Amino acid sequence: LTNKRKDEKTISYAECHDQALVGDKTLIFRLMDKEMYTSMNKDSKNLIVDRGMALHKMIRLATIATAGDGYLNFMGNEFGHPEWIDFPREGNGWSYKYARRQWSLSEPDYLRYKYLMDFDRDMVHLFKEEDLLAFPPEPILADEAKKVLIFKRKNCIFALNFNPSASFTDYSFKAPEGEWELIFDSDDENYDGFSRLKNGERHWSDGKMNLYLPCRCAFVLKKIH
């Protein structure tokens, strides 16, 4: 994520142009595959889709939060567009069928695409509002065994638990002293999460902080005092 030269400006992205074209799969389609065609209704109960939603949000937050100088979305990955792009050509009979992006999918409340779009909008707004890309990420912890990644950027701490099944209570790590407030959470119900954390909850650090880290969840704490 941070393997870049400090003297060269770079743009980070979770998926590239080629993944969206016919012959490959978008990030979200790799995570959910055919389940996207039947289980993107918000009321549907599908563990594969739940997993895909959680990881898609986490991957995008991890990407922008470690970016060098900018973050790039590409043609619908903001809301997890389900299909590929295929421009008219001889091989498809000069068809326009897949030469599109269905932005309307991100509008209805009953489809999960809306919650991915809302997450992306608020995530990008956070980075603009706090001017976070103007400051480099500072590693705090990378726990390979538990699949936990924690780092700091400007006045914010980013905590990501990629563990598929284990949530951690009172997870302890070194952190700058002060009072910290939860300002962004991938597990928020507004982003089709399970709201295992409380919006605005506060934590204190005396040089060490203890946090509850739900599985497949990423969140941001901002120092307020």
Model-inferred region functions:
Residues 42-52, 104-114, 205-210:
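Active-site rim elements
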Residues 92-105, 199-201:
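Short glycine/proline- and charge-enriched loop/turn segments
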Residues 189-197:
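Acidic Ser/Thr/Pro-rich low-complexity disordered segments
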Residues 174-190:
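Solvent-exposed beta-hairpin/edge-strand motifs
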Residues 101-140:
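Aromatic- and carboxylate-lined catalytic core of secreted/periplasmic carbohydrate-active enzymes
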Residues 1-90, 96, 128, 132-138, ...:
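Conserved alpha/beta catalytic core and glycan-binding cleft of carbohydrate-active enzymes
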Residues 8, 15, 53-57, 114-121, ...:
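A structural signal for well-ordered alpha-helical segments within the folded catalytic domains
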Residues 156, 197-225:
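C-terminal beta-strand-rich structural cap/linker in extracellular carbohydrate-active enzymes
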